[in-house]
Amino acid sequence: MSKTLSVDKSQLRSPWSTYWTLTKPKVVALMLLTSVVGMSLAPHEHFTWHQALIALVGIALMAGSAAAFNHLIDRRIDAKMARTYRRPLPKGDVSPFNVLLFALLIGSLGFLSLMLWVNSLTAYLTFASLLGYAVVYTLYLKRATPQNIVIAGIAGAMPPLLGWTSITGELHPHAWLLVMIIFIWTPPHFWALAIHRKEDYAKVNIPMLPVTHGVEYTKTSILLYAILLALVCMLPVLVGMASYLYLFSALVLNVCFVRYAIKLKFRAEERTAIEMFRFSIYFLLLLFCALLLDQQLAL
């Protein structure tokens, strides 16, 4: 009787829910927020809501495609790691071939949307980001060097630039400054998780920094990056992109982030690393929300 009532949850899972999970929707949502900030800060001479919405859909589709490719390429190591063994492919919820078709389909739709109804620059930059994450990072760098996150971080840092170019059709130093913030944020964000999951990464021979250089070295690197991030976050104020609301928010958030890094380095407890990882997500979310609100209040 109990066996009859005990139904595997994976059997009840909708195929749509499975494919939705493959796109890493929470990650994509954060990327879209940073894209919206890029759009908001860009000159608005040629702005239309129609174009902005299509741009966001196109960026989301290609980001989801990159995430699905990541699931596909990493399916064997995901099956061996405690953090990822319940993902759709290791659980058998979907076949690798179907994931490949899904990734190609939504990636193609995203690229065509950007190319036909936004502009070619945004389409090609988004495609380059997809290749950078799905191929260069996931297929090669992740398994090749402990600096994988640093080198490939540019791919995940591109959304503000994509938002900017979707409105203007051109590159601008202010957009690259937003990219720099995410680029510097990425290593301490991922290294905190890597410390918490060090044994997992070691088990599948992924050369994350704590595995190859030790936890203490990684903690020092996180602290240095946190300090550098605090400095970089002040640049939007110095170049006139943001005002006092952003300045206050950035100061508070960076003080908290650096305090986490100091605690991790000198007074770490068992869960300090994972707590810093989780805070880093809220850090980026709140920082870009502050930048967006600051810009809207200045209008």
Swiss-Prot record:
Keyword set, alphabetical order: Cell inner membrane, Cell membrane, Heme biosynthesis, Membrane, Transferase, Transmembrane, Transmembrane helix
Single GO MF annotation: protoheme IX farnesyltransferase activity
Transmembrane stretches, start-end: 27-47, 53-73, 97-117, 121-141, 149-169, 175-195, 222-242, 244-264, 273-293
Catalytic reaction annotation: heme b + (2E,6E)-farnesyl diphosphate + H2O = Fe(II)-heme o + diphosphate
Protein's cellular compartments: Cell inner membrane
This enzyme's EC code(s): 2.5.1.141
Record's keyword annotation contains RNA-binding: no
GO cellular component: plasma membrane
Membrane topology value: Multi-pass membrane protein
Keyword DNA-binding: no
Domain of life, per lineage: Bacteria
InterPro entries in alphabetical order: Protohaem_IX_farnesylTrfase (IPR006369), UbiA_prenyltransferase (IPR000537), UbiA_prenylTrfase_CS (IPR030470), UbiA_sf (IPR044878)
Pfam families xrefs: UbiA (PF01040)
Gene3D superfamilies: UbiA prenyltransferase
NCBIfam families: cyoE_ctaB, PRK04375.1-2
Remaining remarks: Carbon 2 of the heme B porphyrin ring is defined according to the Fischer nomenclature.
HAMAP family: CyoE_CtaB
UniProt record similarity statement: Belongs to the UbiA prenyltransferase family. Protoheme IX farnesyltransferase subfamily.
Protein name (Swiss-Prot/TrEMBL): Protoheme IX farnesyltransferase
Upper lineage: Bacteria, Pseudomonadati, Pseudomonadota, Gammaproteobacteria, Vibrionales
Gene: cyoE
